């Protein structure tokens, strides 16, 4: 995992190709060396997705039980203005290993796509990279 992040950071320094790490989650000290902006899961905050079945979600990668409505039955504007609270207030994510994490204010529980059907954290990117290098 660190090998890939180190490769991306080095490639960006060399500036021979444009390379950036996607929205996979908070990476601690790697943040600005592997992407242009610090991690921020925009799902349901300033990004929404309509899936092929009409489901309205914050992101195509998020589990279906986090869908907020359906474009064939619901007004997108109403859904956007009145739903998505689970995306916009992430305090419910501050459980398990996130409860005492000193980096919570930067990470806010990682990306929504890294949560299981019950809201449990599937992967903590920060612990995977061991944020102190």
Predicted regions and their residues:
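Radical SAM enzyme [4Fe-4S]-AdoMet core and its adjacent flexible, acidic
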Residues: 1-57, 61-67, 71
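Flexible mid-to-C-terminal extensions adjoining Fe-S/redox cofactors in radical SAM and related proteins
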Residues: 61-133
């Amino acid at each position: 995992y660190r090998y890939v992040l180190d490769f991306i950071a080095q490639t960006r320094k060399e500036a021979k190709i444009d390379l950036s790490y996607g929205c996979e989650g908070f990476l601690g000290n790697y943040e600005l060396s592997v992407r242009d902006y610090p991690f921020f899961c925009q799902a349901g905050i300033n990004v929404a997705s309509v899936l092929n079945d009409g489901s309205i979600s914050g992101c195509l990668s998020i589990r279906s039980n986090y869908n907020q409505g359906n474009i064939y039955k619901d007004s997108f504007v109403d859904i956007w203005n009145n739903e998505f609270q689970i995306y916009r207030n992430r305090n419910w994510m501050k459980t398990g290993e996130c409860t005492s994490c000193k980096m919570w204010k930067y990470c806010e529980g990682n990306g929504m796509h890294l949560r299981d059907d019950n809201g449990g954290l599937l992967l903590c990117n920060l612990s995977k990279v061991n944020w102190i290098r």
